[in-house]
Amino acid sequence: MNFYSINLVKAHLINYPCPLNINFLWNYGFLLGIIFFIQIITGVFLASRYTPDVSYAYYSIQHILRELWSGWCFRYMHATGASLVFLLTYLHILRGLNYSYMYLPLSWISGLILFMIFIVTAFVGYVLPWGQMSYWGATVITNLLSSIPVAVIWICGGYTVSDPTIKRFFVLHFILPFIGLCIVFIHIFFLHLHGSTNPLGYDTALKIPFYPNLLSLDVKGFNNVIILFLIQSLFGIIPLSHPDNAIVVNTYVTPSQIVPEWYFLPFYAMLKTVPSKPAGLVIVLLSLQLLFLLAEQRSLTTIIQFKMIFGARDYSVPIIWFMCAFYALLWIGCQLPQDIFILYGRLFIVLFFCSGLFVLVHYRRTHYDYSSQANI
């Protein structure tokens, strides 16, 4: 068993063959794994002092911040790590879109399942501080499920967000990261099963071992990210949390503007700009399903240079519009629900789906095998 474990580590962490021309865009997976591990460690320490009760949840957070030794550090590292996880996840997905990573369907789908686990974990975790924004944000999101029979009662443990809700959310927030950790190993298994991609997209026998060549590149990226992570955690350069969430819950007073965390803003913009609650929920689910459908494409060649020569515009232009629509929805999500922003939000929702569907529908023409024309 010991020899098997040693050989497994050597095969996947030391001698794993990687393309020679991998650049810094391939660091996001390694960085995500490190930050996700930090999230689990800090979360376990915070959970040991947290009280999942509506009468004590807010005050247990204040106890961690004000009375425990370095409790404030663990709390802000955990909050900053959540933002960093989603930032790296979005960059990882966009890199996959740009370099046609969806042509490895097992790796792509397992990564998207992990992304869904991140979304659910972050949402239930946002409710746990039991501040004004946490309570009213959970109320708004759970009310979207009111069109589904008994869904709100099953999730919240009642007709509204209350004490059973925070207990259930705490259990989910504690368990889901460990489920996500299992999905991480599955994702790595499928990645190593097919082999890593590279910026040019061609399969070559010229490969180098992961250690020490590419590990040094990952460590260099980790040094840059950990500096930003510590600066944000210790000094709070960018205000990531809403001030209303530092106020204890008052069920009779609604905040002037209910805004989720920044990484939920694109989905919140879809919910806010659509007048019908069921329709908004369906659009959010379809936006996630669109990413899964991209794995149904089959490319005869993924060589980026040949695509750029013979047919890249049909692929790169809708991908660029897809990214622009996502960033525009992120900005619209934090704006007031005025008519102009609602109009822009609907336009960018249409652009988001049209650009994604264009890639799906035209993949046969866009990714025609031009290898014979390139004499390879």
UniProtKB/Swiss-Prot annotation:
Alphabetical GO biological process terms: mitochondrial electron transport, ubiquinol to cytochrome c
Membrane topology recorded in Swiss-Prot or TrEMBL: Multi-pass membrane protein
Domain of life: Eukaryota
Subcellular location: Mitochondrion inner membrane
Pfam families named in the record: Cytochrom_B_C (PF00032), Cytochrome_B (PF00033)
Cellular compartments per GO CC: mitochondrial inner membrane
Main location: mitochondrion
Cofactor(s) the record lists: heme b
More about this protein: Heme 1 (or BL or b562) is low-potential and absorbs at about 562 nm, and heme 2 (or BH or b566) is high-potential and absorbs at about 566 nm.
General function of this protein: Component of the ubiquinol-cytochrome c reductase complex (complex III or cytochrome b-c1 complex) that is part of the mitochondrial respiratory chain. The b-c1 complex mediates electron transfer from ubiquinol to cytochrome c. Contributes to the generation of a proton gradient across the mitochondrial membrane that is then used for ATP synthesis.
Subunit structure: The main subunits of complex b-c1 are: cytochrome b, cytochrome c1 and the Rieske protein.
Protein name: Cytochrome b
Native species: Plasmodium falciparum
Organism placement in taxonomy: Eukaryota, Sar, Alveolata, Apicomplexa, Aconoidasida
Name of encoding gene: MT-CYB
